[in-house]
Regions:
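Non-catalytic cap/lid and distal C-terminal segments of serine-dependent acyl enzymes
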Residues: 1-183
Length: 183
């Protein structure tokens, strides 16, 4: 699971660091220990360019999330999957794409924007997507077109948003649009 942070955050925001793990990391570790989750590798990347404050410039943050898939598929996935035991037979593009059934991408807020961009530009590398609380407009039709020619069973999207979240209207409209999409 590649799990992206939200705006004004970084790669340590969600799970913490080895020295200072977050409460969420402890929840995951305990769920695995109790058999509620199968063991998994969680990678917490960042779309930030040079600073965790890149999110302060909304247009820059959107540009960084739009381009992030390049670093993800060309550098990060090969680095992770060459260092850890995964389902990929190797790290060539074909081998990584062949293992997409065992890979998910999710993110919160601006990480959710990154999740939709990953769906749009790297669907060949991921089967599962977990966008959470995406409070902005995107070119949804362009995103859905990424699935053109694919069976609806070829990918799975689980959107999450709270009913009191400011992004509720964005996400419910996006979910309705996706259901109505030809893809």
């Amino acid at each position: 699971l590649y799990l992206m942070h939200g705006g004004w955050s970084n790669e340590t925001s969600t799970l913490g660091t080895p020295e200072r793990p977050s409460g969420f990391k402890n929840v995951i570790d305990n769920a695995i220990a109790q058999g509620d989750f199968a063991p998994l590798i969680i990678v917490c990347p960042t779309y930030n360019n040079t600073s965790g404050q890149d999110s302060a410039d909304f247009s820059l943050a959107l540009r960084l999330t739009r381009n992030y898939h390049n670093e993800l598929v060309n550098n990060l996935i090969p680095a992770v999957e060459s260092a850890f035991s995964t389902y990929a037979a190797g790290i060539s593009a074909d081998e990584l794409m062949a293992a997409r059934d065992h890979r998910a991408f999710g993110g919160f807020s601006m990480g959710s924007v990154t999740t939709w961009r990953t769906f749009e530009y790297a669907l060949d590398y991921f089967r599962y997507f977990i966008p959470m609380s995406c409070g902005t407009s995107l070119d949804d039709e362009s995103i859905w077109r990424a699935a053109e020619g694919r069976s609806q069973n070829d990918y799975f999207v689980m959107m999450m948003v709270g009913t009191s979240d400011f992004s509720y209207s964005y996400d419910t409209a996006r979910a309705e649009d996706m259901r109505a999409s030809a893809y």
